Amino acid sequence: MRLIFSITIIILFTFNITAREIGETEITTEDGIEVFQDEKYYLLKKNVKILSDNFNLNAKNVKINFDKSLYDITELNAKGEVNFVSPKFGLNSKSETLKFEVISEKLRVDGKNSELITKDIEMYSDGFIEVNNLNGDFKLEGLNSKLINESIFIKAEKIEGVFSNIENQKEITFLNVIDKKISYVKNNNTEMYAKKINFDNKTSIIELIDNVVIIRNGEKIIGDYGTLDTKNNSYKIKSNNDTKVKVVIQNNE
């Protein structure tokens, strides 16, 4: 069943914006709203603005999925100059397209110059960014993908891992970084280059695979494989050529 509302609903929603109450969701749109009652979704067209208790959204066009009551929003799909701000979920994003699953708190943004910012982490990509706010999973893939926080800078074609809340801050506890050309990670006073860079907080080991370069304290070590132990502040580099000397450098400061 399809019902089409245009001018009446636009006026209604525009009027409500000046007096939105807690629990209400306000929508404005220049080209009207199509309501699909059986399928439980709305189509909002042209310069859409949504204000709610949990988030604010601006976009060219938006599809909203609801629960059975057509009251609670379960999913948002937005296209065109998308801006999404959610103090409740701690998310702020800009993108060409957006998909937000409300119950699972899973957000995906796509397109050139996409960005997703939380209180502790900044993420950028010309491909896509995905974050699950409940279990901490995240993924960035595409050109110019970057992840930045206070202590780390990562740039690669593919970045994925897990955030954990430690002392009310998001920290990376698992990380896989891949780039067929070269990945780059800067952590405190250490710069690392490799095609693959992995980190597991359980072992405190950063693993570097293929075309490895570690720059630290004025020293530059090159090889094919390397590990950096973040607990005892040491690292190793080795080469596939057995005639080359393996290097182990430890800094006890």
Provide a role label for each language-model segment.
Residues 1-5, 13-253:
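Mature-chain termini and adjacent capping regions
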